[in-house]
From Swiss-Prot:
Signal peptide: none annotated. Residues 524-603 bind DNA. There is a cross-link at residues 7, 15, 119, 555, 1695, 1710, 1725 (Glycyl lysine isopeptide (Lys-Gly) (interchain with G-Cter in SUMO2)). The modification Phosphoserine is found at residues 4, 631, 635, 689, 1294, 1385, 1491. A motif (LXXLL) lies at residues 313-317. GO terms for biological process: cardiac muscle cell proliferation; chromatin remodeling; circulatory system development; coronary artery morphogenesis; embryonic organ development; heart morphogenesis; homeostatic process; negative regulation of cell migration. This is AT-rich interactive domain-containing protein 2. The lineage of its organism: Eukaryota, Metazoa, Chordata, Craniata, Vertebrata. The modification N-acetylalanine is found at residue 2.
Length: 1828
């Protein structure tokens, strides 16, 4: 067929092919398929053309009828020779196209029977019998090709309804309304009005309410149909609506003016009232429509359309005002439902006016239903903000009054409805709140409802209420999240190690105020990141992930828990590339689980940040942002703020603002085991005092992780790995603050953040964990203002953490500040077994950078910059692998080479020690820490020597070598440092395991703490501290400098890890006041050249108990304890060969002194014999001494160094110096020494933490013996090895100042020693002779009067005699008052000389508290230590470091006799070994050696059982000590453990800023541990009174008759107890009360009313043994109930009090007042408490409080709802209404009680109380600003 269609051939061909395909498909479906196209005349037949032609002619039938086939043949151009062409076409059409035509053209049903029963196909059967509608449909293809519209109007069912309603046909309308009624019911197919909103209009039109607009149906429905249907809806509405205002809504415009008033009147008279009911046609139809609208109003999608339809609103208003009851109810219900979406028009609109009219009418009604609906409508209207202005203006006061009146009715529903509307109204702002407050008694009623119980409504009332629980996806937001303890999620569940579990427990310290739970999404993302990691080959069940998340949230009591949907969204966020697949689970009957592909569970979960802290504006917020790249390890999700594994109680510490001088440093703690820590805000409360060395030691801040930290906050961060056997290399980044040039404030010089990561493996001693207290270590030197040290303790199972030291760029050398990096594990414990097993255990040795690295780095670093920063040498990380030792726990430190501090930095310190500086102007200390070469050693040189040599002192080429390897020694880079100040970089030592005991970290911590303390303690101290590190060298150098040139260091035994352990162990906490880092001496001694001539103290740590001190083959040159500024060079009575005194130290407590010696050549080294030569310069408080003396060379043993003479190995020996020198150096306090000597036993004890208790404090009663005698490590041995008086911090105590105690001056060195740790150095001159050493002239003059006082940490130590004055007689609390700052360290009579000093030194160390160590110098212990006599070295102390306060627990170590003499070393912050009580006990006896014992403290448990040993009246000594200066920075807190009834309180020196509660926890734990190991000994008599140091007020020592001034406290202990009647078993232990009662509750009532009344409460708790902490009264009441008035606590207090009373009676007569020479004692500085401390205390106690009235029974849902809503209303009123606040003030007391209850509404009430105060203050501020 030629172009028959006129279409182009290609198009035609395409259509033809498409037709053929369709035709084939058609036949195939019918069972008559064809393959070949028929051919006619030799050509294929065009079936498409044939079909088209036939259908155009009318189809097969028409063509056949008209016989038109011949015509068609012609059109196909068949050859004429084909005679039968027409017939053939017809047959082919029949065969192929007829059926197709029949179905597709005519639309007939295909009635063809299935193939197999073919019907005879007759032409007649093809005649169509139906019409084919398909012929009219145009295919989309054609429609598109012809440009026709493709938008179809798809009719839906709603159109049918609309058309039915429009039709007006009665049946259709009824049908449509019935359908609408059914669809409106709640079901799967709720009517959706948006599909055709006209339905509403038509439904309303059928009820006689018409739209006002044109085109409404009023004419049709209202008029035309009324005639046809006899339905008059207008009349209906007029009949049932009586309110004339509402009748206007009835639309009857036409009839309105026709009717006259007369007709209405007649009609009302004669027309019967409408009979409403089922027979009322109009009424029923209106009711039907009202039901439909009400049902639709419950669907959110329909509410907006209904609320926006003004016709609907008119209908509802008419219904609400009708007297057709059912209709009115439906109308009000619907109005209430749509009110929330109803936007009111301006009030001049009729509908808006009528809305308020309706609400008012309902409220004033007498009908309960109407009242409730009226309040519901009003409350919902409040939800739209735009309605607020209208509501506030047009809801009158009468309505408010009516609403409030509902609250007084005993109707649950009415009360709840009323509260709901009041809450919504109060959200509107001050207008509504003021109107509510103006209603009489409204506030009173609401306050009553806050504590109302729904049961008061009676059982019937509640029965009528049906409770429907709606599961909420998120938790109630109304209740404030009460911060639970900030717990680290112990994700490391697989680590079942004790330490880890313990950590969790310990973590429950209440979070600081301002800590807020992080939002749910962030937490979920962190949790996912912490528990899972990307791994394309693994998959995890998604359901399991979510269930684990829910479990974690449940354990943490988190407020917001994500739904599964929200959780999976977080999953997609954290792991964007994961996929999901279904996995059949064969175990669960083939049920499929959804698995997340590409994610696997972490073997070691990361820490999670649960809270963030809103930093007070005042403090520089130190935000540690996670620095992901810090460590090779993935960034940790977040290191928890709180102590992690180590249950450390971190005190929130104010971070001082040192920002001015500091440059930001990065502190990164990359730890392998830890992923980069998510950034967290370090919780460092701002420290108000910046640059105030006095500031309390900042509590340790936990920095979540590496982030640049402003140097301003100097932090020593200790990351402690409490992981059994894991060595965690730590990265340390130390940022030296830029040198602070301020000359005046040395302490401020560059407080640098020091991050010390101490990785410490807890070797199977979870108990050590408690030690975390050391974590508080602050680097005193660093930040005068009291830099918090952050300690991050993480338990990592055997994972190695790589330590990296990051050089802190330009931060001043950390050391310069005298900051001590303390790598102190909070856990001091190392067991002897550990030592023994050290090889097997993770190596104790911390491997510092491999030696090769070390050497190069050191030189490079040192030379590289003048800044003394620890630099990571070459940034190399030493891998543990570097150490052959198998012990996995090795920690590798990168080489730390302190760089010389630029002179500018040093300047502050220099200024402080101008005198010294000249000598050591070039001094620069370089600490090189390198791995010992002998990696193979089990105890690979666990101890690295830290030699801080001032370049000046050392030969230029000499480097102090910390490395265990000798190679390192050569590094001369330090010499370049000389130009820098004497800043000594802090060396960090970490033993791999840190001896697996906390000790090394502890040491470091102690050091840092001491320093900080120094800074804090005395103004001079800051300089000293600064100097301590940097200047220390100066001071030390000054003192030692002459000798420094050759500070030879004996070689410590390289392998002796136990020595290292010992060294480390003693440092329980940041005990070293000046503590520099103590690096355990490497096995290889530094080259001799490194030695400076300065005296060296060699601590010999022997694993053995052997008392012998090996002189490490060191030159006689005395080693200084460089750690502290005041270096006491005490000539040893028996200088070890080589002239270096080696003090065997079981527990090298010396560490407390800045272990890093600042003296030019001082080197700590441990000989293979476990000897460690340590130069300790007491940094801590010695700054003061330095200041005062300028360069006094006093070696004051940092308290941390407790070497008890008794412990031969532990003894600290100071080489004899010329007398003059010794005098200078004598300032050191005696070490009270724990006998931490090398006894294995002790070591074991220490490891276990028992050592404190076990150590016995021996006081040599023979002063004479003392000299020659050294206490062996046991302290029992009265070996004279310690011949030289134990040096406090390397100074002998045997200076002349001591002589009185020494029957003869033990050592010729009668030169006065000023015991100064952190405090102005005071010389203890014999007989009060000014003991200024040559180098101590500056302070000494001031101190002259005070010479007798030993200043420790700025605290005067009592000289021997004076020390004795402090007697245990003083009640603990008194003691705490006296020693309150922990600054007084009575020094035992020097007669006890070296031994005593050693003991005291140890004690000092132990006792040293980060904030200020108290040096309790038990004269006796110090004396005894040197003596053979059973001198009780107070070795036990050495182990304890109390981060928060010095604990001088000279606990009996090995020494059999536990002498009470306890030295609280001013510096030592040694955390108290568990149970150790470090008591600063002045020895009651005169300094005389024998008397030294007088105050023996049996402080095993921290209880001071000290018997006061009456010392021979060594009153000269007393005279020498005019008084004990009070250190502002420290207070001694007596902590009693209510659980240990047998233990007396532990005295702890607490830094001023520290939270005593934290200290108390640590101390109690320590005491508990000790107690387990040893019977408690009581040292009650630690009552040295701290008097302001400057005035050097006399210290009262109770029990010392010689005391010139009676200690104020002493009286109380001496009071006769009130008469005790039968049955009275509980005594009030309030100061001077002692009344007996029958029950604990009576004691509590008595104490709360008699001692805690408004008029009598003194501002702090004076309970015996309680710290003098300023408390708000409510906080005190809570504290009293929790801590003192429980049955256990009272019994424990009685047990402690009994021995105390006896001791007090003995010593009361002996308590002389020390030193009238000092000016009147300055009032002890009030401990600065956090502004929210009271609230925190209430929070902590609230869990224990019992409010029987409303918490005995669990709150029911109704009760909870009423209380919570009432509380929210009160909160809003307090927030917005001034009038309301005035009225609320009356109820503040009641609300306060409720706010600390367990009610659901308690947190809301707390917010209400907050609004009462905060809003007033803010308004006052606004007024002030406006005035300005």
């Amino acid at each position: 067929m030629a172009n028959s269609t006129g279409k182009a051939p290609p198009d035609e061909r395409r259509k033809g092919l498409a037709f053929l395909d369709e035709l084939r498909q058609f036949h195939h479906s019918r069972g008559s398929p064809f393959k070949k196209i028929p051919a006619v005349g030799g050509k294929e037949l065009d079936l498409h053309g044939l079909y088209t032609r036939v259908t155009t002619l009318g189809g097969f039938a028409k063509v056949s009828e008209k016989n038109q086939w011949g015509e068609i043949v012609e059109e196909f151009n068949f050859p004429r020779s084909c005679s039968n062409a027409a017939f053939a076409l017809k047959q082919y059409y029949l065969r192929y196209l007829e059926k197709y035509e029949k179905v597709h053209h005519f639309g007939e049903d295909d009635d063809e029977v299935p193939p197999g029963n073919p019907k005879p196909q007759l032409p007649i059967g093809a005649i169509p019998s139906s019409y084919n509608y398909q012929q009219h449909s145009v295919s989309d293809y054609l429609r598109q090709s012809y440009g026709l519209s493709m938008d179809f109007n798809s009719p839906n069912d709603y159109n049918k309804l609309v058309l039915s309603l429009l039709s007006g046909l009665p049946n259709e309308v009824d049908f449509a309304i019935n359908v609408c009624t059914l669809l409106s019911n709640e079901s799967k197919h709720v009517m959706q009005l948006e599909k055709d909103p006209k339905i509403i209009t038509l439904l309303l039109a059928n009820a006689g309410v018409f739209d006002d607009t044109l085109g409404s149906f009023s004419s049709v429905f209202g008029e035309e149909w009324r005639e046809k249907t006899d339905r008059d809806f207008v009349k209906f509405w007029k009949d049932i609506v009586d309110d004339n205002e509402v009748r206007d809504l009835i639309s009857d415009r036409n009839k309105a003016h026709e009717d006259t008033p007369g007709e209405w009147i007649w009609e009302s008279l004669f027309h019967p009232p409408r009979k409403l009911g089922i027979n009322d046609i109009e009424g029923q139809r209106v009711l039907q429509i009202a039901v439909i609208l009400r049902n639709l109003s419950f669907e959110e999608s329909n509410v907006k359309l209904l609320a926006a339809n003004r016709t609907c609103l008119r209908f509802l208003l008419l219904s609400a005002h009708s007297h057709f009851i059912s209709l009115r109810q439906l109308g009000l219900d619907t109005l209430g439902n749509i009110a929330a979406e109803l936007l009111l028009d301006p009030v001049d609109f009729r509908t808006t006016h009528l809305m308020f009219h309706t609400v008012t009418k309902c409220l004033m009604s007498r009908d309960r239903f109407l009242k409730m609906r009226g309040m519901e409508i009003l409350g919902n209207l409040c939800k739209a903000e735009d309605n607020g202005v209208l509501i506030c203006e047009y809801v009158d006061q009468d309505s408010y009054r009516e609403i409030i009146c509902h609250l007084t009715l005993p109707d649950v529903l009415l009360v709840t409805s009323t509260l709901e509307v009041l809450y919504m109204l109060t959200e509107m702002g001050d207008v509504a709140c003021t109107k509510i407050a103006k209603v009489e008694k409204s506030i009173d009623v609401l306050v009553c409802l806050v504590s109302m119980d729904a049961q008061m409504f009676g059982p019937d009332a509640l029965a009528a209420v049906k409770l429907i629980e709606h599961p909420s996806s998120s938790h109630q937001v109304l209740s404030e999240i009460r911060p639970q303890a900030i717990e680290q999620v112990q994700t490391q569940t697989h680590i079942a190690s004790g330490p880890a579990s313990r950590a969790v427990v310990a973590q429950h310290a209440a979070p600081p105020p301002g800590i807020v739970e992080i939002d749910s999404e962030k937490f979920a993302c962190q949790w996912l990141n912490a528990h899972f990691e990307v791994n394309p080959d693994c998959s995890v069940s998604r359901a399991e992930m979510y269930s684990e998340y829910l479990s974690t949230c449940s354990k943490l009591a988190r407020g917001g828990i994500l739904t599964s949907t929200g959780f999976y969204k977080c999953l997609r966020t954290v792991f964007p590339n994961h996929t999901v697949k279904r996995v059949e689970d064969s175990t669960s009957s083939g049920q499929a689980h959804i698995h997340v592909i590409g994610v696997k569970r972490r073997a070691l979960p990361l820490p999670i940040q649960m809270y963030y802290q809103q930093q007070p504006i005042s403090t520089p917020v130190v935000r540690v942002d996670a620095v992901a790249d810090l460590s090779p390890t993935p960034s940790p999700a977040g290191i928890p703020h709180g102590p992690q594994a180590a249950g450390n109680h971190f005190q929130r510490t104010p971070v001082t603002n040192q920002s001015s001088n500091l440059t930001a440093t990065q502190m990164s703690f990359p730890v392998q085991g830890i992923h980069t820590v998510a950034q967290t805000v370090s919780r460092i409360p701002p420290n108000p005092s910046v640059h105030t060395h006095q500031q309390q030691n900042s509590p340790v801040t936990v920095i979540q992780n590496k982030a640049p930290i402003p140097c301003e906050v100097v932090k020593a961060t200790v990351i402690q790995n409490s992981v059994p056997q894991t060595a965690v290399p730590v990265s340390i980044s130390v940022g030296g603050a830029p040198a602070q040039n301020s000359v005046g404030q040395n302490h401020s010089a560059g407080p640098q953040p020091v991050t010390v990561v101490n990785s410490q493996t807890l070797l199977h001693h979870p108990s050590v964990m408690p030690q975390p207290s050391p974590l508080h270590t602050v680097v005193p030197g660093q930040v005068p203002s009291g830099t918090p040290v952050t300690v991050i303790q993480q338990t990592v199972p055997q994972s190695r953490m790589f330590g990296r030291v990051q050089s802190i760029p330009a931060c001043t050398s950390t050391v310069s500040q005298g900051q001590q990096l303390i790598t102190t594990s909070p856990q001091p414990m190392h067991t002897s077994s550990q030592q023994t097993a050290a090889g097997s255990q993770p190596q104790d040795t911390v491997i510092i950078a491999p030696p090769q690295y070390v050497t190069t780095s050191a030189s490079n670093i040192v030379s590289a910059t003048s800044v003394q920063n620890f630099q990571v040498a070459t940034g190399q990380v030493v891998t543990i692998a570097g150490v052959p030792s198998p012990q996995p726990s090795r920690v590798g430190f990168q080489n730390i080479a302190p760089k010389p501090l630029p002179s500018q930095q040093v300047s502050p310190s220099v200024v402080q020690q101008p005198i010294q500086q000249p000598q050591q102007p070039a001094q620069q200390s370089v600490v090189i820490v390198s791995q010992p070469a002998q990696q193979g050693q089990a105890y690979a040189p666990a101890i690295h020597q830290i030699v801080l040599a001032n370049p000046a002192a050392l030969p230029a080429g000499q480097t102090v070598q910390l490395t265990g390897q000798p190679n390192i020694t050569p590094s001369s880079s330090p010499s370049p440092v000389p130009p820098t100040n004497n800043q000594v970089p802090t060396a960090m030592s970490s033993s791999s395991t840190l001896q697996s005991q906390g000790p090394p970290p502890t040491v470091s911590q102690m050091l840092s703490v001491k320093r900080q303390q120094q800074q804090q303690h005395s103004p001079a101290a800051p300089a000293q501290q600064v100097q301590v590190q940097v200047q220390q060298p100066q001071q030390v150098q000054v003192q030692v400098q002459p000798q420094q040139p050759s500070a030879g260091v004996g070689q410590p035994a390289p392998n002796e890890s136990s020595l290292i352990k010992q060294l480390l162990l003693p440092k329980r906490g940041p005990s070293t006041p000046g503590g520099k880092l103590i690096l355990p001496a490497p096995q290889i001694p530094p080259p001799n050249n490194a030695r400076a001539p300065s005296p060296q103290v060699v601590y010999q740590v022997a694993n053995n108990q052997a008392a012998g001190f090996g002189v490490q083959g060191q030159t006689p040159a005395q080693q200084l304890l460089v750690g502290q500024q005041n270096v006491q060079l005490v000539q040893s009575a028996m200088p070890p060969a080589g002239g270096v005194q080696t003090v065997p130290i079981s527990n090298l407590q010396i560490l407390p002194g800045p272990l890093i010696s600042n003296s030019p050549a001082t080197i700590f080294q441990g000989t293979s014999g476990n000897q460690v030569t340590i130069t300790v310069v007491p940094n801590t408080s010695f700054a003061t001494a330095t200041v005062s003396q300028g360069n006094a060379a006093q070696l004051i043993a940092p308290a941390g160094l407790s070497m008890s003479g008794a412990q031969a190995s532990a003894g600290l020996q100071v080489q004899t110096l010329p007398a003059g020198q010794s005098a200078c150096t004598t300032a050191p306090l005696p070490f009270k020494g724990d006998k931490i000597i090398c006894q294995k036993e002790e070591e074991a004890k220490e490891a276990t933490g028992l050592h404190v208790h076990e150590r016995k404090i021996e006081v040599m009663e023979n002063p004479s013996c003392r000299r020659g005698t050294t206490n062996t490590s046991n302290g029992d041995t009265s070996e004279s090895e310690l011949q030289v008086g134990s040096l406090l911090n390397g100074r002998k105590y045997s200076d002349s100042s001591l002589p009185p105690s020494n029957s003869g001056k033990l050592q010729s060195e009668t030169s006065q020693c000023s015991l100064i740790s952190n405090g102005p150095s005071l010389e203890l001159g014999e007989n009060g002779a000014p003991g200024k050493q040559n180098s101590e002239p500056v302070d000494m003059q001031d101190v002259k009067g005070d010479l007798k006082k030993a200043l420790v940490n700025g605290i005067c130590d009592f000289d021997k005699g004076d020390g004795s004055h402090l007697s245990k007689n003083i009640p603990n609390h008194k003691t705490s008052n006296h020693v309150g700052n922990g600054e007084i360290s009575p020094v035992e009579p020097q007669g006890t000389s070296g031994a005593t000093q050693q003991d005291t030194a140890k004690g000092d160390q132990l006792e040293r508290v980060s904030n200020g160590p108290v040096l309790t110098l038990g004269g006796s212990p110090s004396t005894s230590s040197m003596q053979e006599a059973p001198s009780v070295a107070t070795p036990p102390l050495s182990g304890t470091d109390l981060p928060n306060g010095p604990l001088a627990s000279s606990l009996n170590s090995d020494v059999p006799q536990q002498r009470p003499s306890v030295v609280v070393s001013p510096h030592s912050t040694a955390p108290v070994i568990q149970g150790h009580q470090v008591i600063a006990v002045p020895h009651s006896g005169p300094r005389v050696t024998p008397s030294a014992l007088s105050s023996d403290a049996r402080s095993t448990n921290g209880t001071a059982e000290c018997k006061t040993v009456k010392r021979p009246a060594e009153d000269n000594d007393r005279d020498t000590v005019p008084g004990i200066p009070n250190k502002v920075g420290v207070r001694i807190v007596t902590i009693s453990d209510p659980n240990n009834a047998g233990c007396s309180a532990t005295m702890v020196a607490v830094p001023a800023g520290a939270d005593p509660s934290t200290v108390a926890k640590v101390a109690i734990e320590s005491a508990a541990q000790q107690k387990q190991q040893h019977p408690p000994t009581y040292m009650q008599s630690v009552a040295p009174q701290n008097t302001p140091m400057p005035p050097s007020p006399a210290v009262q020592v109770q029990g010392q008759p010689s005391s010139s001034q009676p200690s104020p406290v002493s009286a109380s202990s001496q009071h006769a107890d009130p008469v005790r009647k039968p049955g009275q078993n509980f005594m009030c232990l309030w100061q001077s009360c002692k009344k007996w009662f029958q029950t604990p509750s009576q004691v509590f009532y008595h104490a709360a009313t008699e001692h805690g009344g408004k008029d009598v409460y003194p501002g702090q708790c004076l309970w015996e043994g309680c710290e003098p902490f300023q408390r708000q009264r409510f906080s005190f009441i809570t504290h009293l109930q929790d801590k003192h008035c429980s049955k256990d606590a009272l019994l424990a207090g009685l047990k402690q009090d009994e021995p105390g009373q006896v001791a007090n009676q003995k010593s009361s007569t002996k308590q002389p007042t020390v030193g009238g020479t000092g000016s009147a004692p300055r009032a002890q500085k009030a401990i600065a408490s956090h502004p929210s401390a009271a609230l925190m205390a209430l929070r902590r106690g609230s869990r224990n409080l019992v409010f029987r009235d409303f918490t005995d029974e669990k709150e029911g849902p109704i009760t909870k709802h009423i209380r919570l809503t009432a509380a929210l209303i009160l909160k809003n009123i307090g927030k917005y209404s001034e009038c309301g606040r005035r009225l609320l003030k009356r109820h503040e007391n009641n609300l306060s009680v409720l706010a600390i209850s367990n009610m659901e509404a308690s947190s809301t009430l707390a917010k209400c109380l907050y609004e009462l105060n905060f809003t007033v203050q803010s308004k006052e501020q606004e007024k002030d600003s406006e005035m300005l």
